[in-house]
């Protein structure tokens, strides 16, 4: 459902602009449609999948230990299928317009090409190497910004505004980096529609066009996503100072607390900040070290067991 929203809005905008000969929208309207589609896609899917719409993001989060490897194949498959179905929906909606624009032909290149409505293709001047760099930079920028949005120690996104901010990231990437090859920055967003165009009648040209361009939007975003995560971890995240009762957000949006039982002063105010969906990581545990005479804990009506059992 979430990927359908992205493809229908984004590719639908490209179809409208293309088949109307730019009389019903321009490049900016395409960028806005993809950005708003991403916004609602994230909003729709956040509670179910953590809003994983992009295999590059999912893979990068697996590599840094913030997503489960066992889930990755199923997420990627669903993302590609969703993109395929989204492209099919746009084709069905704009079938007459596409056939009229192409003179009854489904072509990949030339003045009446329509394959780029669904998948990305390089500009005539773009080399494969330059296109690869373009996609690495664009996806790296995406991950760098996403990492900041979910970093609870670095002014994280206000609760409820995450979808809009993710959409804003996509918008600015499109405005700044969209002219070379359509800023796929997402392997599924390109592969799903490309597979659809192949099965719908555009033929093998969808894979061979642009000097076999099809592999670039599959591989380059993966490289860019990994680099974006590494850059954020090395230059930002590892420099955060760890604070008592530090909050960290896990993949489902719940809150995790690191509590040093040897130093933390339990009181009613502290305990009421914890909710049933939160998790506690016990560190420097005096109970396990035989230091159960800790006066602060003896005076408290709660101990380690009551905290752990609550969660």
Predicted ranges, named:
Residues 1-311:
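Membrane-interface helix-loop junctions and terminal tails of multi-pass membrane proteins
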């Amino acid at each position: 459902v979430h990927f359908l929203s992205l493809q229908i809005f984004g590719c639908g905008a490209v179809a409208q602009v293309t088949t109307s000969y730019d009389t019903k929208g321009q490049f900016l309207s395409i960028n806005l449609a993809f950005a708003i589609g991403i916004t609602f896609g994230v909003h729709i899917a956040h509670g179910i999948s953590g809003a994983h719409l992009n295999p590059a993001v999912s893979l990068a989060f697996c590599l840094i230990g913030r997503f489960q490897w066992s889930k990755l194949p199923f997420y990627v498959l669903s993302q590609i299928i969703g993109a395929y179905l989204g492209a099919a929906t746009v084709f069905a909606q704009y079938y007459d317009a596409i056939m009229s624009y192409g003179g009854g032909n489904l072509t990949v290149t030339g003045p009446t090409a329509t394959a780029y409505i669904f998948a990305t293709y390089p500009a005539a001047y773009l080399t494969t190497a330059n296109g690869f760099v373009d996609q690495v930079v664009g996806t790296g920028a995406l991950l760098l910004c996403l990492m900041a949005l979910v970093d609870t120690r670095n002014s994280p996104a206000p609760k409820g505004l995450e979808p809009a901010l993710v959409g804003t990231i996509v918008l600015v990437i499109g405005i700044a980096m969209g002219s070379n090859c359509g800023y796929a920055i997402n392997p599924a967003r390109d592969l799903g529609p490309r597979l659809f165009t192949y099965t719908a009648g555009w033929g093998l040209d969808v894979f061979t066009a642009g000097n076999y361009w099809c592999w670039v939007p599959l591989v380059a975003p993966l490289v860019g996503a990994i680099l974006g995560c590494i850059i954020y971890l090395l230059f930002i995240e590892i420099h955060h100072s760890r604070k008592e009762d530090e909050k960290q957000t896990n993949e489902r949006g719940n809150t995790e607390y690191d509590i040093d039982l040897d130093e933390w002063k339990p009181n009613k105010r502290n305990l009421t900040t914890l909710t049933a969906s939160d998790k506690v990581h016990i560190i420097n545990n005096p109970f396990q070290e035989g230091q159960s005479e800790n006066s602060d804990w003896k005076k408290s009506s709660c101990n380690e067991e009551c905290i752990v059992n609550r969660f």
